[in-house]
Amino acid sequence: MAEVPARWLLGLVFIWMGLSKALQPVEFLKLVRQYDVVHGTLLLNSIAAALPWFEILCGGLMVAGIAVRGSALVLAGLLVPFTWMVLHRALALHSNVPFCAIRFDCGCGSGEVFVCRKLLENAILILVSIVLVCGRGRKCCVRYELV
């Protein structure tokens, strides 16, 4: 029974974060660029344009209860490398500042965040995603799996 609120929470978080990025694509592009992972203008622009809508789509599928396992797997697949990049960037910024006092706009759509809080938040979202991928709760689902 806890899978339904977990599914709705995960879906709404991604809808909210995706919308905040989609409504400010230029700002999101700048934040993607700061990680210095992707090179090439076309690829950067494509990521900044498509990723927010992909997050909104997966979040909407979660809330609606359509393809829950696949959507949860995709969201976990987005969260794991993003969390790694946030950690890597925080470690690069960590000089004379205590680690948990580091703040920056990570690009998740919630503005400037403390790194320890963001890492904990992402770890919880990853765990919720894994529970939904491995779980079999079908309550309030339109279609749990596509296949």
Which residues are covered by each model-predicted region?
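Extended, low-polarity transmembrane helix blocks
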Residues: 1-26, 53, 60, 64-147
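Solvent-exposed, well-ordered loop and adjacent helix/strand elements within mature globular domains
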Residues: 17-51
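Membrane-helix exit/interface motif
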Residues: 33, 58-61
